[in-house]
Amino acid sequence: ERADSGFRSCASVQTSLVMWPIHALGSPEQKARWLPRLRSGEALGCFALTEPLSGSDPASLQTRAVPDGTSWRLTGYKRWATNGNKAEVAVVWAKAGGDDARSIRGFLVERGQFQARPIPGKMSLRASDSAELILDGAVGEPLPGATGLGAALKCLNEARYGIAWGAVGAATACFAAARDYVKERKQFGKPLGAFQLVQEKLARMYTDIGLAQLSCVQLARLKERSALTPVQVSFAKRAHVAMALEAARSARDLLGANGITLAYPPIRHLLNLETVKTYEGTHDVHTLVLGKHITGLDAFA
């Protein structure tokens, strides 16, 4: 993500939201067929949960799956499917036989069964392939372990872990650009970096990035021991993305008018991070996750 959040989004979806559910929730046949191709990059996959009227409330999704002999037919409309225009397979979430969160199931839908259309006019994540998917009686193969909304949320938790790391990379790129600029740019007869207020901003960015790096290391240690909890991942995703956004804004400020041009990376990272703040659970949603953990009281509804 130090290069661009769009690149990390592509990799994050491929690994956490496509390969992981096939690995953890799929059948032996599904694993054998798809994981080698996805792992090598021969095939791309996408994850289709969000809909035009279902974002932070995924339980309200409207896509339906009905049995048709030995297969299932899916009908619905998905939006913001990263990699969707080039995906060979989509992990699609639909309601099967009911209208509550327990009826949600995950399906593998192959290219040719869905129509993908690019989402135009983006000012953020321009390097990311964002698509809307149209399913009109699409043939879907159920993932045996992907039952209930909780299965979809487990996938998202894997992706959020990667976002917590990636946001630190974006912040580091912004810090490096600002540091190099203020060492060379002169005003009032000396480098900008020689002014106290400039050094204060750099010191704050440096400290915040360092703390987030230490947090990532602790997350990894917990994950290696299978001790990492969804609340800890929400904590890190929320805190690290907010930190990276502030770093991007500070870096843009230190670059002055030059900071609004694409000659320097902070403004691009700033726009990208506005999207990262929203996807895989918005900043406010993760605030409520932490609030429930702290108080034991559910404030979602």
Where do the language-model regions lie?
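A short core secondary-structure module
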Residues: 71, 75-115
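Conserved hydrophobic/aromatic beta-strand scaffold that supports enzyme active sites
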Residues: 46, 62-64, 89-93, 106-108, ...
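Short beta-alpha junctions and helix-cap segments that line functional grooves
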Residues: 34, 61, 77-79, 118-121
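A short, Trp-centered hydrophobic/proline-enriched beta-strand micro-motif
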Residues: 41-49
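Flexible, small-/acidic-enriched active-site or ligand-binding loops
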Residues: 60, 111-138, 142
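Short Gly/Pro-enriched turn/cap motifs at secondary-structure boundaries
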Residues: 53-56, 80-83, 95-98, 122-129
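Well-ordered alpha-helical segments within folded domains of soluble proteins
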Residues: 14-19
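Alpha-helical interface subdomain recognition
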Residues: 1-2, 10-13, 25-30, 37, ...
